[in-house]
Amino acid sequence: MVVSLTDVKSGSRVMVARIRGGLGIRQRLSCLGIHPGDIILLQKSGFMRGPVLVNVHGNQVALGRGIAAKILVEVKL
């Protein structure tokens, strides 16, 4: 099932299915090392409107909730 990154529980491993949004969003996430097909670990999803902290390719990346909501993922067991 494909859901938004903001809907996933902390500690979950997910695969990036696709990225919603325009070229600017896709380029920004690409510069941060986030691409469709990548496996990322959701380390912390801030309560309410806080940032989302993920680990991708061994690097910690903090994302605003608006950008995190544009990342559609599949939860990996």
Residue spans for each PLM region:
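Compact, glycine-rich, soluble single-domain proteins
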Residues: 1-77
